[in-house]
Amino acid sequence: MNHSEWRTRRHRQLLGEHLDADPEYDRVYEEASLAMTLGKAVYDRRKQLGLSEADLAERMHVDVDDIEGIETATELPPIAVIMRLARALDLTVDVHLAGGDEPTVTIVAPAA
């Protein structure tokens, strides 16, 4: 399912149309939700630390475009990148994936 198809389906749902269950839509929606949660946490923590996107990219040895993609939720990075983000931003990231449960991402900054 591409973004346009997802957006059209979401729009139809918001208009109150009854739509048949679509596992692909649910998967894309879930991934987008996780990406947005992570992106907001990364942006907030980066700003809290007074870092620019370039500073964070340098700490992680990635391109600035990679940081922008994470913060704007255009991509859900693999676990290895999430671990590098956690180290670079001094965060604890807990990803809970359990069959049947909604996946959760908990991001905790150290107490000030």
Regions of interest found by a model, annotated:
Residues 41, 52, 78-81:
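Residues that mark the N-terminal boundary/hinge immediately upstream of a DNA-recognition element
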Residues 42, 53-57, 67-70:
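Conserved hydrophobic/aromatic packing and binding residues within compact polymer-binding modules
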